[in-house]
C-alpha cells in the first residue's frame, strides 16, 4: 500500500509538471498574438474595466487585446455562423466572446466552439464549483466556456420613495396599481427584460418542472398561460400604460433617478452600489428581490473553433479568473460584478477582500429555464405586446 501511495504521488506530480509545461507552451505561443475580444459595450464601468485588462495583457503577457464593443452578442454569433458557412475553419474574426446562455447553446449545438479547455486553465483551481459553472441555461458547458462573473436578477428602489418594496409577483401587481405609471421593465428581447419574463414565469406557472426542458408548442401554451394573464392585468398600470417600454436597464436607472419610476431592474446584484459610487443613482438606492428567490446564473467567455489566436485567448480567459482581476471586478467603485471564485481557496488577505465585496442579504438563486424557452418567450411577447 505504501508503494501504491508513493506511485500515485509520483504520478500526480508528473501530471502537474506536464500541465505546467503545457501551459508554458500556450503562454509562449500567445506572445505577440492579437486577441479580438467581442463583448457587450453598453456600460461605461465595464468598458473601463476591459480597458484595464487590455493594458495588463500588453504589459505582462505581450498580448494585444482588442475589445470589440457590441450592442448585442448575437451580432458576433452571426459573424461566427457566417464564417462557418463560408468554410472559414481558421483565422476567424472572433477570438474570445462574452456570451449568454442562449448564444452559447446556439454555437455549441452547431459545433462552433472549442471544448475541453476551460478546466485546464491554471486559475480554475480558485473557482467556486458550487456555482453553476458547468452548465449554462441547463446546457452542459463541457469545458467550452470559462466562468467570468456571477449574476442575479435584482430590483432597485429608492428608500426615500419606496421604503417597503413588493416581494412577490402579486405584491408587485398591487404596487403598480397603487402607483400607476411608475413601474415597467425593459422591452424584450433586451436580456434583462427577457429575464423578468422568465422570473415571473417560474413563479406563476403551475408546472415549473417543465422549464427544465425545451418546450414544444403545446407545453409552451399551457405553461405560459398564467404569465400572459398576469401581464394583461399589469400592463395598463405600467409606465406609458404598457404601450411603450424602456429599451434598456440603463434607461430605467435614469428614470428612477429622475423620480419617474419607483423601480429599476438589473442582472447584477451589486449594480446599485456601483451606480451610487459613480453618482448615477441617488444614495438612497437599494437592491431587493422577491422573497422566494430571483433567477441567477454565471456569465462566461468562450473561444470559437476557428479562433485566430486561440492560445492568447486562453491566457486572457485565465487572467480574467485571476484573484487580482476578480477582486478588481467585484469592487463596486470599478464594476461591482460578483466573483466566481471561492474565497476559501484564496490566501488570507485576498479572501477577506473578496468576502467584503460580495453582495449581502441576497434572495435565494433560482435556476433559469432551459435556453429553449428564451426565443419562444420573446417571440410570443412581441406578438402580444410589441406592436403597440
Curated annotation (Swiss-Prot):
It comes from the Bacteria. GO terms for biological process: transmembrane transport. One of its GO terms (cellular component) is membrane. Pfam families: SBP_bac_8 (PF13416). InterPro entries: SBP (IPR006059), YnjB (IPR027020). Disulfide bonds: none annotated. Residues 333-357 are annotated as: Disordered. NCBIfam families: PRK11622.1. This is Protein YnjB. It comes from Escherichia coli (strain K12). The lineage of its organism: Bacteria, Pseudomonadati, Pseudomonadota, Gammaproteobacteria, Enterobacterales.
